[in-house]
Amino acid sequence: MNDAHQVLVAYWAAAESRDWDTLAGLLAEQVVYEAPQARERVRGRAAYLRFNVEGFPGDWHLNVERIVGEGRHAASWVEFSDASDGYPGVCFFDLDEDGRIARITDFWPTPAELPASRAHLVERY
């Protein structure tokens, strides 16, 4: 499997089902994960799997809204939900020459209040 779109479909399905063996098979040995907003970086397949298993315990779910990909690059928009709330996530992926995920750049925006100066310009949803 080396099409970026197919790799992401398999990645999110494995994450949602907590199928860590399948997820591991999609990752390059030296995968690098970064979350710029939190300034988090995780290096290596084993460390990234541990980050997911230990860092996100409990009953959470992912719903894939959109995946776009071309060649060795792809992006996804997912909704993460747990018992307390839901969060949108936008994630960028780069594949290596073997079609494995080599880099993940993850953005999880938090809800923001609308500035009063723009209230008359937008529709809230």
What are these regions (language model features)?
Residues 1-125:
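C-terminal and inter-domain tail/linker signature
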